[in-house]
């Protein structure tokens, strides 16, 4: 390009800085988006204690095709008296879960919906889906575990457009009204809601 400018091609010479500016801008754009995206993501590792979780409703129906095949509809309530603040400095107060299970001897698929309430009144809506497995010990006692995925799909207030993805592990026993959950993952908010003051 230096040789051309010396031969009198001023038009090309004048365009050169402009073209460099465009190229530099295009090169930096993905870096800027990546930085903003990383700032908006919140890592989560949380536990829901069995002592503060209880099945408030359960309806079980025998399918009748093979022994032990049952369809169940359930409602689960969780409270969080000693919860840790999230990335917006808000604590959970309670969660209501409404779900379904399709089990044979407590093995099979379970899925449903959650509504998580925060201390400022905002709510987060979630879906969960996964598989339960039950092992029977020599003494006849059972241990049931659920492994699946929980997704944040929206909410209210600053969480209206929240999205999230979590690995969920649950140890449960519906007969003993016991349910203890562990979630690992992250959620993110649109840039327009980050930094908003609490309601």
Residue ranges and their predicted role:
Residues 1-11:
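Short, Lys/Arg-enriched N-terminal segments with co-localized hydrophobic residues
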Residues 21-32:
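Bacterial N-terminal signal peptides
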Residues 37-199:
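Beta-strand-enriched cores of mature, soluble protein domains
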Residues 13-22:
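Bacterial N-terminal signal peptides that target proteins for export
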Residues 8, 14, 34, 55-58:
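Intrinsic disorder/low-complexity detector
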């Amino acid at each position: 390009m230096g040789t051309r400018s010396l031969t009198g091609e001023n038009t090309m010479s004048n365009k050169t800085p402009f073209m460099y500016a465009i190229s530099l801008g295009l090169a930096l754009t993905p870096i800027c988006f990546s930085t903003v995206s990383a700032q908006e993501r919140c890592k989560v590792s949380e536990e829901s204690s069995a002592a503060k979780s209880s099945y408030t409703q359960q309806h079980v129906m025998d399918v009748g095709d093979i022994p032990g095949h049952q369809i169940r509809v359930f409602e689960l309530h969780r409270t969080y008296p000693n919860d840790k603040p999230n990335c917006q400095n808000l604590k959970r107060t309670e969660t209501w879960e409404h779900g379904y299970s399709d089990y044979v001897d407590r093995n099979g698929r379970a899925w449903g919906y959650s509504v998580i309430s925060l201390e400022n009144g905002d709510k987060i809506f979630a879906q969960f889906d996964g598989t339960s497995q039950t092992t029977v010990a020599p003494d006849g006692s059972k241990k049931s575990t659920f492994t699946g995925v929980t997704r944040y799909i929206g909410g209210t207030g600053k969480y209206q457009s929240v999205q999230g993805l979590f690995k969920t592990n649950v140890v449960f026993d519906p007969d003993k009204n016991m349910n203890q959950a562990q979630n690992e993952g992250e959620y993110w908010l649109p840039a327009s809601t980050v930094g908003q003051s609490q309601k």
